[in-house]
């Protein structure tokens, strides 16, 4: 059994190279050979071992005795000694355990021997074999030689997760051996199916064995083995044991020290690590930089005089240092002679501090470039050179550079934002970013990204406490989890609301920024701010003549009334003496001719001259009372309302006048307009002296009868109205008569005499009563229609 293992090691070596070389020929990948000279010696030795192993294979098929076993033991020992030459070669790439390029299976496990994971072989033998003797375990545990005949079937380890691709059947020369598992994650595409090369070998009973062709010189194996599609980011943390075969693949894991669930590097960036360099695994942490480079960065930020200079310097340093660390020149440059960025480079467009209304760059941060260490812990290892420790950490050495990380993506150049946008994803296939709304870029849409508005106040810069980076929120294991969840209905609504474009948004931002772009102090107002309430000329209202008081010089007694739209001319305004003469003239003209149009125009002209000159005296009260009486007599209640409103204001200034009379008129006017609110207010401010006034007492009694629906008392009071109260009651007397008529028709049966109705509703005569009843469409009865048929007229009550 041990001999079989030794034969497996030798044949696997040549088979692997035959397989890969065949794949390279098929794909047309003829690359120049760059290999160690020791490989050629190894292949020659292994070729001879393979031939002797093939000769001993026929004896194995007929006899499994100790002679064959001893032969294979010697072959295994020779293979193990050959392998020891390359064990140190693997160690320079920091592999903790021997590296296996292929599947970790013993070739002859299937003949009854247990596999590495305790599983039986995929096919059995006619004669079950016993496990190897304990003395051969050391040989089995020696580092394996890369390569194994893929035509031999195997059983996949139980710890491996199944691949997304189903198992591929073997080619016809190997039809008896079917793969029982999918390709291992991270292996080359050539390992997912059998090679179609010529198969010339000897048979072990029903099983066909292919002697591999000598590999063609070409590119080294680990440079040709690219990961299968969809498997570059997968990785499994299989428990490793010393000197045990592992399932690591150079195509998917460039560094043996990677954690099983750690961030994965890009396979295309790490497949060219054939040259040994001490800085092949660069880190973005300043602790890993050369001392000259650290001093250079400090000099750059020390030379900055303002925050804008720091922003510009930070942006330039990101470009320079990132390129130098990637190509390795950062360790060879004399940084003490390197000029500062501002001395040799022109300021890049948009290099000053970005305005907060400008959209930020939509570029995604590089994969693996945003893993920030938390609490000064160990930095997360990334495959991208110079991008492993790009984030800021509390209390780390970034404070030496002015709290600026020169490797952060230029997502926002504002120095006031302490936590920049960083990659919160855990795999290379996600590009979600998390940015705070207090960054200078107000919104950034990259693909399907949406940056919600959230926290406003940035954390204090340069503080090392636990609350200095509250925007990071969750731990390393939880970071980015919110992006992995499916968006809920509420979040979709919020995102839709954020994505709504406001056409005025940019204009508003520019106006808002224009107010703060100049840092000058606010100038104090030399004069107190006065709110002008008189600027209503455009709306058609009268100007405030209190500010335009003049003394008129016009001697004219009569003057046409015109609305003023500008400052009044004193030559067109009459003084008080002339206005008194004009008022007497208007009174006489009204008594003689009853020309309301002329009287109203002259009264309004007098009122205007008084207002322009700011005259509010006893004469002003007389003018308004005269105009109110003329309007009442003519029935112009609009003009009366203007006059009584001004009279109420003048009476409040304790100017003498007919206060009781016009208070009664005001109460009756409120009854006419059915303004119960103003009536209640007026009643509340009535003094005892006013209540004792005859006009006010009459108005209060009339209001009580109106409120109670007592039409009999109402019309009795109407007939005995003092002064000019009757003119106001005339405005709503017919309305109250209809209400009273409805009540009478409902009450009186079968007929209602017209004579009784005339007396009860306070008509002056029967003719006036008939004129009132005629348009109502009532039914009459009796001789000469002297009575109203209440039963027939009941249907007409709804019409009035």
UniProtKB/Swiss-Prot annotation:
Where in the numbering of this chain does the PCI domain appear?
Answer: 636-800
Keyword list, A-Z: Acetylation, Phosphoprotein
Compositionally biased intervals (Low complexity): 47-65, 412-427
Organism superkingdom = Eukaryota
Q: Where is the composition biased (Polar residues)?
A: 124-142, 178-197, 245-256
Gene3D superfamilies, alphabetized: 1.25.40.990
Question: What's in the GO CC field?
Answer: nucleus; protein-containing complex
Q: Using the record's annotations, give every residue carrying the modification N-acetylalanine.
A: 2
- Compositional bias segments (type: Basic and acidic residues): 32-43
Task: List residues, modification Phosphoserine.
Answer: 351
The record's section on InterPro entries has: PCI_dom, SAC3/GANP/THP3, SAC3/GANP/THP3_conserved
Report residue spans for region: Disordered: 24-66, 118-291, 328-506
Q: How does it assemble?
A: May be part of a SEM1-containing complex.
Under the heading PANTHER family, the entry gives: 80 KDA MCM3-ASSOCIATED PROTEIN, LEUKOCYTE RECEPTOR CLUSTER MEMBER 8
Q: What protein name applies here? A: Leukocyte receptor cluster member 8
* Organism, scientific name: Homo sapiens (Human)
The encoding gene: LENG8
